[in-house]
Each structure stands twice: as C-alpha cells, then as structure tokens.
Amino acid sequence: MTRAPASQSPHRIALLFNANKVYDREIIAGIGDYLRSTRVAWDLFLEEDFRCRLAGIERFDGDGIIADFDDPAVAEALRGCPLPVVAVGSSFEDATQYPPELPYIATDNRKLVSLAWTHLIGAGLPNLAMYSLPVAQENRWAQERELAFQALGRKEGVPAPIYRGQATSASAWNQAIEQLSVWLHSLPKPVGVIAVTDARARHLLQACLIHGIAVPEQVAIIGIDNDPLTRTLTRIPLSSVIQGTEEMGKTAAHLLHQMLRGARFPGQRILVPPVGINVLDSTRHEPLSSPHVMRARHFIRQYACQGIKTEQVADYVGVSRSSLEEYFRRELQCTVHQEILRHKLDAAKAMLASRDASSAEVAIRCGFTSLQYMYAVFRRELDCTPREYQDSVANASAPRLSTP
C-alpha cells in the first residue's frame, strides 16, 4: 500500500496586472489554465478589484512574481527584486529594451501587424494606414507596432501613413473625433486602417459613423485584442487580431514554475505569435462602383435591426426607391430588402450562437416583426429553426473526447 505524497506548502505568487484591460485578463486566464492543467500549488496574490497597485510590493513576503512590464512603473518597482520574476509585455525591435536579467514573454508585434496588413490587402484594399497612440513610455508597445507597420510599407514600396491622435479624455473627446475625421477624409480611398488596439478602432468607427464615411466600403477597420466589450459598443461589428495572450500566460507560469525549482533563465525571450483574426463586418470590403450602394449599405449596417424599410434607406441616400433598387440589382444582384434581411439574419445567428438571449428576445432585438417571421426566415434561408441552428453551433463547438 503506497502512502499519499505529503502535501506541499503552496508558493505565494504575485500577479501584477491591470485586469481592466482584456490583454491583461487573458494573460491571467492563461496562468490559471496552467495551474488547472498541472499539480502546481500556488497561492495567488491579486488586488480584489484586479488592479495593479505597487505600494508595499517591496515587502511582499512571497516566492515569485509574474508582471506586466509594459507598465514602466512595474518595471522600475521590480528592478533588483530578489524573488524570481517573469516579465510579460511587448516585443521590441531594439533588443536593448528588454530587461537583461529576466526571462521575458512577449507578444510578437511584427506578426500582429503583418497579419492585419495581409488581411486588408487580401480584402482588396490598395491603401493602408495606421491609427496609433501618442508617444509615451507607457505606450512603447504602440510605437513598436508603428515600426512594424513602417517596415512593411518599406518592404512593399507603398506609403504607410500613421496618425497618433490624442490621448482619450472627456474634455478633448469632441476635438479628437473631429481631428480624426479630418485625417480619415485626407486618406486615399478605399483604405484599410490598422488600429493599435480595439479601443482605438472604436474611435475610428465613431468618427466614420458621425461623418458618414462608409465602413468598410471606403474605410475598412481592423483592431488588435479581440475585446468582446468593445464589440458591444459598436454598431458595425469590428474585425480584430487575436493575440496569443493566454499562451503568454501559460508560458510565463511554466517558466516561473521551473524557476521555483531552481532553474534560471536570465535574458531569455520568448515571442508568442497571434492566434488569428476574428473577421467581422468592418473589413468585409467589396469594391463597389456606385456611391449610392455604398451609402445605402453603410446605413443598413447601422440600422437593419431597428426595423428600417427600403423607403428609409432611399431617403437617406437621397434617391428614389426604384433607382436604388436598380443600383442594388446591378452591384449586388439583390434587392434592398434582401440586403436588410441578410444583416438581420447575421445578427440573429450571432446572438443565438452566444446563447445570451431567448429566441423571442433575439427576434425583437434583430428587428423581426414577430418570432414567427424569424422562424420563417430561418426555415427559408437556412433550412432549420432558430433552436436547431443554436444547437448545431453548440454541437460544433463542443470538445471532442478521443477514445482509447
């Protein structure tokens, strides 16, 4: 009869991240995944509101730290720390920017930007630009994305304009959006714009909606982070590059686990590539010759789920209903009503897949006149009911267990 192994005292580990950002939250989630998939016993210290506060960190009576080194204050506070530390943050073109004495897990900025660039070029956009952040120590990662963007421009022999805009503040918000719209109007069209974060991408969408710039016909927009909260705040679903943040968290936890057992990795750098792109409406660019169709689709994307009719679209565009129908038949081989219905159906499919609402709620929120009408549309277009569609999505995403 074998004895059970003696229980080990858990290691006390501090996680210094600001989980109000999706980037930090997903790194923390990756650390949690590592703990669940191993027999590691860690007592994790985080602030109750998941914010990073450095006061007293020098007196932390623990065994190790995983920290966000994109925050200059964190990097400074941990300089010379006697505990094992794993740094997490941005990749750098200049290798001297990495902390020389620590292992460093980095998001690969060059690959993030390259993936966004390739996606926009593949969508048929001949012009590209970037919307970044003002230069600041805490924004060094954004400047690294600028360098990657400019390098691609030089490699391809094309212009690579960058606009940094203003830092976000309530007092300067209106002015910032106005200046952003001026820059957007100055760009050759059609253009694809890479925003250094989803938050900056939302600014672009706001400016386009306020000033009647068609997305994605005139300006296609892609962000970085795949932040679900940002998606809820935009009328036009935002395409975004998915960072490998959970893998970064797992890798950081794995390194610290080894360090707690005596291993050392001074100066080791591990670059983690992006997972892929969540492609949504903001980059589904289709070259169109008719400005009337561009303007109509811009309006439909915003208001399809609010029960708009063909007459309202024609009024917005400023042409007769019959003329608009003719433009649609030539360009899209469909009617205006069919285009409105397509957007309603796409919205309903997305809501059903998320399982956040009942079928009746989906019908109301997606602008169908009744639940019965939504059922009829699903039957006609997808040959299934909304419930059957929801079940098929759930079954497709369920994990498959291999049999021995």
Regions found by a protein language model. Give the residues of each.
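Bacterial carbohydrate/catabolite-sensing allosteric modules
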Residues: M1-G64, V74-Y316, R321, E325-E326, ...
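Residues within the helices of the helix-turn-helix
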Residues: E311, H337, A360, A376, ...
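A secondary-structure capping/hinge motif
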Residues: F328-T335, V377-Y389
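Intrinsically disordered, low-complexity serine/threonine-rich segments
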Residues: A398-R400
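Intrinsically disordered, low-complexity protein-interaction/activation regions
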Residues: S402-P404
